[in-house]
Design a protein with these regions (language model features):
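N-terminal Rossmann NAD(P)H-binding glycine-rich loop of SDR-like oxidoreductase domains
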Residues: 1-20
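SDR active-site strand-loop-helix element
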Residues: 4, 28, 60-61, 98-104, ...
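Adenosine-cofactor binding site in Rossmann-like domains, unifying the SAM/SAH pocket
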Residues: 26-45
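NAD(P)H-binding glycine-rich loop region in Rossmannoid oxidoreductase-like domains
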Residues: 39-79
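NAD(P)-cofactor binding segment of oxidoreductase domains
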Residues: 71-99
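Catalytic helix-loop patch of NAD(P)-dependent Rossmann-fold dehydrogenases
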Residues: 78, 82-83, 106-147, 151-154
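NAD(P)-dependent short-chain dehydrogenase/reductase
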Residues: 136-184, 190-198
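Mid/C-terminal beta-alpha module of Rossmann-like enzyme folds, strongest
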Residues: 195, 202-251
């Protein structure tokens, strides 16, 4: 199995869980991985995949910064969509199973409700648009699985994850924008990884297509951050109430 984006928040957790469960796995990232590779150099990416011929590729790579996706839509499309199209082509050629990690960012302005795979989607910004395009590329391949989710956890290096950003903001008494109109069913990366590995290891009845993997609970970003502050005993009076439509203030 090859995991693309193995040094990211989810990639790190998935690599660790895979090895604990005795999976043969190769982590790929630009640096500090089993294989250092710029996956946007598509020629090198294809040659690498051809040389390894894995049974499964898990794509954890994405630009998730909402502001960056708005500022540079071409880059967002390249990473969130076009890369997936390239992976589909090589996976189809070599009959490799492709697992593409997507997002729950399509469910906006419909309140506190749970969603299934048939729930209507809303492409509210460039992040949602490019991730949805990536889904469509992946789903054009019969031997693929697209997973919509909202994972939370720690990266411990590089740009802060949402959880790390929240902790840092609370600790340093920074202003935090709390979105009341964006609900999620966030799941921690380690629980998600264990579920995904069970799906990959499932014999006979292989799951393909589109599925959601999430928490059984639903809350908006305001509720999530306020609960987080209570659990970690942080008092922060610099909360601003905002809307996801404004984009500013949220790091996913």
């Amino acid at each position: 199995m090859i995991i693309l984006g193995s040094t990211g928040m989810l990639g790190q957790a998935l690599i660790k869980a895979a090895r604990l469960n005795n999976f043969k796995v190769i982590g790929v990232a630009r640096s500090n991985a089993d294989v250092a590779l710029d996956v946007l150099d598509f020629e090198k990416l294809i040659l690498f995949i051809e040389s390894k011929k894995p049974k499964v590729i898990v794509n954890c790579i994405a630009i998730t910064d909402l502001n960056l996706c708005e500022a540079n839509p071409e880059k967002a499309y390249l990473v969130n969509a076009h890369l997936v199209a390239v992976l589909v082509d090589i996976c189809r050629e070599l009959n490799i199973r492709l697992i593409h990690i997507s997002t729950d960012h399509f469910f906006v302005n419909d309140g506190n409700k749970k969603h299934n795979e048939a729930s209507p989607t809303v492409l509210v910004n460039n992040y949602a648009k490019t991730k949805y395009a990536g889904e469509q590329f992946a789903l054009s391949y019969q031997n693929s699985l697209v997973i919509r989710t909202n994972v939370v956890g720690f990266r411990n290096s590089g740009k802060h994850t949402f959880i790390e950003w929240v902790l840092s903001s609370l600790k340093n008494q920074k202003e935090v924008t709390l979105f009341q109109d964006f609900y999620t069913s966030s799941i921690d990366v380690y629980t998600f990884s264990e579920i995904l590995l069970k799906i990959i290891d499932k014999e006979g009845d292989i799951i393909n297509g589109l599925i959601n993997i999430a928490s059984s609970e639903v809350c908006n970003k305001e509720q999530f951050i306020r609960k987080f502050a209570i659990v970690f005993n942080y008092k922060n009076n610099k909360f601003n109430i905002g809307s996801i439509m404004s984009i500013n203030g949220l790091n996913r």
